[in-house]
Amino acid sequence: MKNATDKEVNKVLMVFFSATGNTKKIADRIQQKLEGMEVKVTKYDITSYQERNKVLSLDEYDAIFFGFPIYSLRAPRVCREWLERQEGNDKLCSVFFTYGGFGKEPAHYYIKELLTERRFVLVSTAEFLGAHTFNYSGWQAAEGRPNQSDFEMTDDYAVQTLQKFRARDVKTVCDFEKVKYTSEQLDQAEQFRFHLIKQLPTRDDKACTMCMLCETLCPTNAMNALKGTADAEACIACFRCIANCPDSVLHTNDIAAAWENKLNMHQTTKKAIDQMKSQIFL
Ligand SMILES: Cc1cc2nc3c(=O)[nH]c(=O)nc-3n(C[C@H](O)[C@H](O)[C@H](O)COP(=O)(O)O)c2cc1C
């Protein structure tokens, strides 16, 4: 519903990072919803390092959606580094996350802080459940998500955010409480994944057709298809290579044994995670 004082918002940019496809599914759904309301959406996928290194002009867009997975309680480091190079010039924006049903609060707080530093104006955020990346290695978190209820929430998010863009309504936005973890503590938490994923994506070379896709798609240029493994310094354990291998010959060590521990650490159960709902913050 438009008000007389509303500003035109007809061209929207959608910047997203998606290694295993969950965030892209939400981005696609937002695009579909907005285009149904005659808003043109241009998608810009920053998953590959080549795209992240291009200079992007934001001038021609009325507003921007950013979509990121949550990695170790925040937007992935490579996305934050990309954002640090952008100039917001008071452009209106919104951020949505996908996450695997564990920690997520600091992601909203820290993305707001970073976007404000870069002079973007945040009008809303949202979080959507997405099958946990580490399910490829034996976990069972948020399997089958995003699902129909997440997509319905996505539609609401798209509509409500568009209304806020048009009204330039930034009054109540995302008043996230100061989080209990400092950036330095979160940097340390980021390293924790390598305590679990001890063997980086590695090829079981029996059936490999050497298509090189793992190397081409790697977001950080870490994968070496000929060697059949990833560089330990550069790999961010995003599993893009594993998720997209047409021969299904890439794997890490099996972390199924760490699943119960993970649930206990978070004082939760598989059922509780499966029942979690996606949320919008206006
Ligand atoms: C390195 C890494 C760290 C992650 N950290 C978290 C986390 O802190 N909390 C959480 O709930 N999910 C976490 N996840 C799961 C992802 O946020 C989730 O699976 C997301 O939907 C993946 O998005 P994509 O399919 O677009 O890549 C992590 C995944 C990876 C690869």
PLM region descriptions:
Residues 2-13, 20-48, 54-198, 256-261, ...:
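FMN-binding flavodoxin-like domain, especially the glycine-rich phosphate-binding loop
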Residues 52, 229-232:
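Short, solvent-exposed loop/turn positions at domain surfaces
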Residues 196-206:
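DNA-binding recognition helix and immediately preceding turn/loop
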Residues 203, 209-230, 240-258:
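Iron-sulfur cluster-binding cysteine motifs and their immediate structural context
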